[in-house]
A protein has these predicted regions:
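Short amphipathic alpha-helical interaction segments
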Residues: 40-55
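Short alpha-helical segments that sit at the start of domains
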Residues: 1-24, 89
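Short, amphipathic alpha-helical interaction segments positioned at domain boundaries
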Residues: 74-89
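Short acidic, hydrophobic short linear motifs in intrinsically disordered regions
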Residues: 23-34
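DNA-binding alpha-helical recognition surfaces that contact promoter or target DNA
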Residues: 32, 48, 81
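A short, conserved structural fragment
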Residues: 54-64
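Minor-groove-contacting beta-hairpin "wing" of winged helix-turn-helix DNA-binding domains
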Residues: 66-75
Length: 89
């Protein structure tokens, strides 16, 4: 995947989280969303992207309230500001 495709993938993830806000989403839901956007990822590749975006403070990964072992992702205020600045909302 080249740099432009990675940017589009990251935008797809962030926009999906923005649409769900303030609710967090599990990785499996994000996988379905990026597949609908035309990206084919496995669990590991998605986790790498989520970790990257979390490192940039654009999203946060938290454990599920019902099961601590199941992570969920949520858009941060910084992530929303980024999407607004890029006219993606």
């Amino acid at each position: 995947m080249d740099a432009e495709q990675k940017l589009l993938l990251r935008h797809a993830i962030l926009r999906q989280l923005a649409a769900a806000a303030p609710v967090s989403l599990p990785p499996v839901t994000l996988l379905h969303g990026v597949a609908l956007a035309g990206f084919r990822l496995d669990d590991r590749a998605l986790q790498i992207e989520l970790d990257y975006l979390a490192g940039k403070n654009l999203l946060e990964i938290t454990p599920s309230a019902l099961s601590q072992g199941l992570p969920r992702a949520r858009l941060t205020a910084t992530g929303r500001d980024y999407l607004e600045a890029e006219n993606l909302l």
